[in-house]
Amino acid sequence: MPVTVVDHPLVRHKLGLLRENNISTKNFRELANEIGRLLTYEATKSLPTEKKTIHGWAGPVEVDQLVGKKITVVPILRAGLGMMDGVVDMIPGVKVSVVGMYRNEETLEPVRYYVKLAKKIHKRHAMILDPMLATGGTLVATINLLKEAGCRRIMGLFLVCAPEGLARLEKEHPDVEVYTAAIDERLNENGYILPGLGDAGDKIFGTK
């Protein structure tokens, strides 16, 4: 399974700021979007382009333009919305598909409560957004949904990942590409990532 840890000084610095326990909602939102933007840069660098001649200020000029399948960004509600603006900044015309999942705190398994996918999603590459890949249950359920809808190329963008979640993804969907700012140490007994970020959804939305 292709896993890319985006090892860049800016990413490491911004992730370090995100880990501060008393970070403000404003700063957490801004940093999550900034890292999302940097992850998008890495995740899209293999997109195909073609040469096209346009009319420049001094006459015809040959440029590169994206070609091929379009992308749909898939934020997993609610925390995935905290990375979406950064991605949309990089790909302004991207279509947004929304998947609502929450994790049952007792079983740690995902529960789906809302789905709204882009039209002709089977013709698009899907880019899943979720700040944290913990047990992998929510991610696997989302990938199952997208594959059932016809998606053939799926990637996931995460601020931090747990080894346990990556192992589950490797077992169930080894074809999915992962882009992350860090792979953390482990999950605790409650299924939270250590050292992690705390509850990313609460920090993004200012709730508890």
Swiss-Prot record:
5-phospho-alpha-D-ribose 1-diphosphate binds at R78, R103, D130, P131, M132, L133, A134, T135, G136, G137, T138, D199. Uracil binds at I193, G198, D199, A200. Binds 1 Mg(2+) ion per subunit. The magnesium is bound as Mg-PRPP. Pfam families: UPRTase. Its cofactor is Mg(2+). Keywords: Allosteric enzyme, Glycosyltransferase, GTP-binding, Magnesium, Nucleotide-binding, Transferase. CDD domains: PRTases_typeI. The keyword Glycosyltransferase applies. It comes from the Bacteria. Allosterically activated by GTP. The keyword Metal-binding does not apply. It catalyses: UMP + diphosphate = 5-phospho-alpha-D-ribose 1-diphosphate + uracil. Pathway: Pyrimidine metabolism; UMP biosynthesis via salvage pathway; UMP from uracil: step 1/1. Gene3D superfamilies: 3.40.50.2020. GO terms for molecular function: GTP binding; magnesium ion binding; uracil phosphoribosyltransferase activity. One of its GO terms (biological process) is UMP salvage. Its EC number is 2.4.2.9. Catalyzes the conversion of uracil and 5-phospho-alpha-D-ribose 1-diphosphate (PRPP) to UMP and diphosphate. Belongs to the UPRTase family. NCBIfam families: PRK00129.1, upp. This is Uracil phosphoribosyltransferase. It comes from Solidesulfovibrio magneticus (strain ATCC 700980 / DSM 13731 / RS-1). The lineage of its organism: Bacteria, Pseudomonadati, Thermodesulfobacteriota, Desulfovibrionia, Desulfovibrionales.
